[in-house]
């Protein structure tokens, strides 16, 4: 079969080694004669899978002992509700930074539960889209927490700064598309959440990292499956969890450790992004409209100077084994999502194609 590189924004490419191992174990997991999908989530076999996955995840991010790790349903959008329902307490407002599509979606959901104070961080620098530095974010005095999205998959915008607002500010963040791609100081956050389908594993699983002093504050109307305390007290098994997604995510964690961990992956991700942005920046045929300081290393949107060639580009790239390059309907153009599982060979194949396409159509 010809080599295919999947640039989908999510569900996204999984490491080939992980897929191969899952395929080998699919019908007979560890000699049980059954699939891991078929065993009880409360049996000792799956409990071992769950415990190993959590420990490997903790190791990869150096998660402090006073933080709990929850394996949840609901995706990032579920946490758009889960965060206010768990953290508002007796307060009626929270600070929300608007820097892109997903941040705005979180704000829209939060309005059901509180009156968010919106910090519009979107700016333009030399004609390109950018984000205000954190020192310019005007936080309110009465906010229960601060929420932001470090990586906007649709806009291709990243906020790489580490928050430093003092211990009185509970920082929450949607790391769905950038978790495990670069070192992360978990201690600077109150809550970190991430849908699994981009940098962790298959869709259906959501990870939440929550500082333990923030437990026990859920609103009485909070659904039990979103209540961090309920989930923690039941080892993330208040109801049947997405066991296969949990198992596969655990395999990805072991794969990441074998690659050298998050620091090693960060170096590779930088190389991939530099390679792709380099081709875009050295061409009049392609363009990216995000300021360099806020460019995402995970999601690279780009446009053709002649958008009548978009359809041809997508058809020819697909035929060349470069799949899922169509940009989001909100922004159009192209988008290459180059998460951890995308090898540098895939990015090299894309850039070679882009150079050749420009030669033939420019």
Curated annotation (Swiss-Prot):
Binds 1 pyridoxal phosphate per subunit. Homodimer. Its cofactor is pyridoxal 5'-phosphate. PANTHER family: PHOSPHOSERINE AMINOTRANSFERASE. Pyridoxal 5'-phosphate binds at residues 76-77, 102, 153, 174, 197, 239-240. InterPro entries: Aminotrans_V_dom (IPR000192), Aminotrans_V_PyrdxlP_BS (IPR020578), Pser_aminoTfrase (IPR022278), PyrdxlP-dep_Trfase (IPR015424), PyrdxlP-dep_Trfase_major (IPR015421), PyrdxlP-dep_Trfase_small (IPR015422). L-glutamate binds at residues 9, 42. Catalyzes the reversible conversion of 3-phosphohydroxypyruvate to phosphoserine and of 3-hydroxy-2-oxo-4-phosphonooxybutanoate to phosphohydroxythreonine. Belongs to the class-V pyridoxal-phosphate-dependent aminotransferase family. SerC subfamily. Pathway: Amino-acid biosynthesis; L-serine biosynthesis; L-serine from 3-phospho-D-glycerate: step 2/3; Cofactor biosynthesis; pyridoxine 5'-phosphate biosynthesis; pyridoxine 5'-phosphate from D-erythrose 4-phosphate: step 3/5. This is Phosphoserine aminotransferase. It is found in: Cytoplasm. The gene is serC. The modification N6-(pyridoxal phosphate)lysine is found at residue 198. Keywords: Amino-acid biosynthesis, Aminotransferase, Cytoplasm, Pyridoxal phosphate, Pyridoxine biosynthesis, Serine biosynthesis, Transferase. PROSITE patterns: AA_TRANSFER_CLASS_5. The keyword Acyltransferase does not apply.
């Amino acid at each position: 079969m010809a080599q295919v590189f999947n640039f989908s924004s999510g569900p996204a490419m999984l490491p080939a080694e992980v897929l191969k191992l899952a395929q080998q174990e699919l019908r007979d997991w560890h000699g049980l004669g059954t699939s891991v999908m078929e065993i009880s989530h409360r049996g000792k076999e799956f409990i071992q899978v769950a415990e190993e996955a959590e420990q490997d995840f903790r190791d990869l991010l150096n998660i402090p002992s006073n933080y709990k790790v929850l394996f949840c349903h609901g995706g990032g959008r579920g946490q758009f509700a889960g965060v206010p329902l768990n953290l508002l307490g007796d307060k009626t407002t929270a600070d929300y930074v608007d820097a892109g599509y997903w941040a705005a979606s979180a704000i829209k959901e939060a309005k059901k539960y509180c009156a968010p104070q919106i910090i519009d961080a979107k700016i333009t620098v030399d004609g390109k889209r950018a984000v205000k530095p954190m020192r310019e974010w005007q936080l309110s005095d009465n906010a229960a927490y601060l929420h932001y999205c470090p990586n906007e998959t649709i806009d291709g915008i990243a906020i790489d700064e580490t928050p430093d607002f003092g211990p009185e500010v509970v920082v929450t963040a949607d790391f769905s598309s950038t978790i495990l791609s670069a070192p992360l100081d978990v201690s600077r956050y109150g809550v970190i959440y991430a849908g699994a389908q981009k940098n962790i594993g298959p869709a259906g699983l959501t990870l939440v990292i929550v500082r333990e002093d923030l437990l026990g504050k859920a609103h009485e109307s909070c659904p039990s499956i979103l209540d961090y305390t309920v989930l923690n007290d039941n080892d993330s098994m208040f109801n049947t969890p997405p066991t296969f997604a949990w198992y596969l995510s655990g395999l990805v964690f072991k794969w990441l450790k074998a690659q050298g961990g998050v620091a090693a992956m960060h170096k590779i991700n930088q190389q991939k992004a530099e390679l792709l942005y380099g081709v875009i920046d050295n061409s009049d045929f392609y363009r990216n409209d995000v300021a360099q300081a806020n460019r995402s290393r995970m999601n690279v949107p780009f446009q053709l100077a002649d958008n009548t060639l978009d359809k041809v580009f997508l058809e020819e790239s697909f035929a060349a084994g470069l799949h899922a390059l169509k940009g989001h309907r909100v922004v159009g153009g192209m988008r290459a999502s180059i998460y951890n599982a995308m090898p540098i060979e895939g990015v090299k194949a894309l850039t070679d194609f882009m150079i050749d396409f420009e030669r033939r159509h420019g």
